[in-house]
Amino acid sequence: MHTQVLFEHPLNEKMRTWLRIEFLIQQLSINLPIADHAGALHFFRNISDLLDVFERGEVRTELLKELERQQRKLQAWVEVPGVDQDRIEALRQQLKSAGSVLISAPRIGQQLREDRLIALVRQRLSIPGGCCSFDLPTLHIWLHLQQAQRDAQIESWLASLNPLTQALTLVLDLIRNSAPFRKQTSLNGFYQDNGDDADLLRLMLTLDSQLYPQISGHKSRFAIRFMPLDSENGLVPERLDFELACC
């Protein structure tokens, strides 16, 4: 059985921001519990990147709009015969609940911005080697605390992101499942089509091909060019089958 590789590409700025936030939040949990300097720097660098993303746009506002939009889309399915009404209602309640929690939550990332340790580490991250023990004695002593003490602090930091994480996960799941994968064929490594107001492209390639897609475009139209991983000796077949979902 061929191994399939999934690629996702945003077709607008809000989706680009959401995918970056999702990626960074996932990265925060990868190396837990934090037991050494390398794990700590990975964690704090992702916290810093996440706060930078928060400062660039109205994340909460866009998410609340999307939660409402998804509720309207579900409402349109209520009158369709054969639809699982219980499932529709359960999803609507989840969307409503996530919106209520998000709108009543403090400013996204505020607890992280106000934390002294996070602020100190953020100041040094842009300096090559700037997180040595003599630069950041606060981090050095923090890493020598009892593991349970560090774990509790990290748990508190991550919990402050829960309103965002829950809403974002729900929205992205609905968007990703809004369109099925369909078989498509590229000619000489190129494929283009209309976006039909899609937010996200999802593309499946077999690993055997050792190709990757370069995607450009927006919600109205997009183009995909397939490139060989080995730029010197790799070949792109004249016809390449792949699976594509426009979500």
Swiss-Prot record:
Q: Which NCBIfam families match?
A: PRK05287.1-1, PRK05287.1-3
Q: What is its main location?
A: cytoplasm
Source organism (scientific name)? Salmonella typhimurium (strain LT2 / SGSC1412 / ATCC 700720)
* Family from the record: Belongs to the ZapD family.
Pfam families found in the cross-reference section: ZapD
Q: Which HAMAP family match?
A: ZapD
Concerning InterPro entries, the annotation shows: ZapD (IPR009777), ZapD_C (IPR027462), ZapD_sf (IPR036268)
Full protein name: Cell division protein ZapD
Tell me a GO cellular component: cytoplasm
Q: Where in the cell is it found?
A: Cytoplasm
Q: Which Gene3D superfamilies match?
A: YacF-like (1.10.3900.10), YacF-like domains (2.60.440.10)
Matches recorded under PANTHER family: CELL DIVISION PROTEIN ZAPD
- Asked if the Swiss-Prot or TrEMBL record annotates the protein with the keyword Cytoplasm, the reply is yes
Q: Which UniProt keywords apply?
A: Cell cycle, Cell division, Cytoplasm, Septation
